[in-house]
A protein has these predicted regions:
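Sequence contexts marking disulfide-bonded cysteines in secreted/extracellular proteins
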Residues: 26, 84-86, 122, 243-245, ...
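C-terminal motif of bacterial Sec signal peptides marking the signal peptidase cleavage site
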Residues: 21-24
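N-terminal Sec/ER secretory leader and immediately downstream segment
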Residues: 28-171
Length: 333
């Protein structure tokens, strides 16, 4: 049997506090796809629409995610020796008024530059022993603190908070936006994994701050899963209303088959495939959001949302396959 679009589709805690009626009204196109789909199914079933509530938990605010990093007092010791290896000006800039109010992106770039500078100084042979000892101590302390600076860059920076705090459906015409976000996240990943040879994180800060691609994708995946689960429940709850078989009135089956073709195959499935495509494009960069329980209990659960999205799709497709088998329709016919 040729499973056609059904098999092809299968092959292929949330960002803001809000309670929505899953079968209710929506403010934009993608949400209407699911609403229309369920409405037409319920009409054919001659049944009430099942309504489910879904509560989205907000992305924690910056103050809830910011990890404290004890400051190290680095005095301008032996300024001549530090100048020789390029560390003096860096420390002086950090100790300035502007340096003390740097955001998480600039702070991360400073921490990377400081470690690189300390390494250069230690590789020289003209430092006094007491300076070498102090720099080695600073290096050890900074390396121990580095994971906390990385965490703060990902979760407590204004740019990444903006990027992850989504509240609307993604549309199917934002390919350029997704590519820009993917490129920016790739840059951040390099800065996290090979910081001493990567470019500054501030190079992509504006791109990340001016969109909420990740947040809106997370919202869309989560919302689509919930909508589809509600529609699957609608179908299974009133499955007995769809009569088929020899010498039976199969009018409702013909009608619901039309709903499947026109609404699901024609509209919902293409949108779901687009969401999945956006996720796959960003997926190589999402490792930075894996859980880090040693640092914090929170993690950005976009991978979980995509797993639930795939599972919801599989359950929905399973229902239609079972219905078509019961009623003798060959998929793709």
């Amino acid at each position: 049997m040729n499973d056609g679009p059904l098999s092809n589709l299968v092959k292929h805690s949330t960002l803001f506090c809000l309670t929505v009626m899953l079968a209710g009204c929506f403010s934009d196109g993608p949400g209407d796809l699911f609403y229309d789909y369920q409405t037409k199914i319920a009409r054919v079933q001659d049944a009430d629409e099942i309504k489910e509530e879904l509560e989205f938990e907000s992305l924690p605010r910056k103050r809830e995610l910011l990890l404290d990093v004890p400051s190290l007092s680095i005095g301008l010791i032996d300024s001549y020796q530090l100048r020789q290896c390029g560390l003096f000006n860096l420390i002086a800039e950090r100790n300035s008024v502007l340096g003390k109010v740097a955001d998480e992106f600039r702070n991360y770039d400073y921490q990377v530059a400081l470690l690189a500078g300390v390494g250069r100084c230690l590789s020289g042979s003209e430092l006094d022993p007491e300076v070498v000892e102090l720099l080695r101590e600073i290096e050890q302390q900074k390396l121990a603190q580095f994971p906390r600076h990385q965490w703060n860059l990902i979760y407590a920076s204004d740019a990444m908070q903006s990027q992850m705090r989504g509240s609307q459906w993604l549309h199917a015409d934002i390919g350029d936006q997704v590519r820009q976000t993917s490129d920016a996240l790739e840059h951040i990943n390099r800065a996290l994994n090979v910081p001493l040879v990567s470019g500054k994180t501030t190079e992509v800060q504006e791109v990340l701050e001016k969109s909420s691609t990740l947040g809106d994708l997370y919202y869309s995946l989560t919302r689509a899963s919930a909508e589809l689960d509600t529609i699957t429940k609608q179908l299974t709850t009133f499955d007995d209303n769809i009569i088929c078989g020899k010498q039976r009135d199969t009018t409702k089956f013909r009608y619901i088959n039309n709903v499947f073709e026109q609404q699901y195959i024609g509209k919902v499935q293409p949108y779901m495939a687009q969401l999945d495509g956006y996720y796959q494009q960003l997926a190589p960069q999402l490792g930075m959001f894996d859980a880090q329980p040693d640092l914090h209990s929170y993690y950005f659960p976009i991978k979980d949302a995509h797993h639930a999205f795939r599972s919801s799709t599989r359950r929905h497709v399973d229902y239609w396959q079972q219905l078509f088998k019961r009623c003798g329709r060959k998929v793709g016919r």
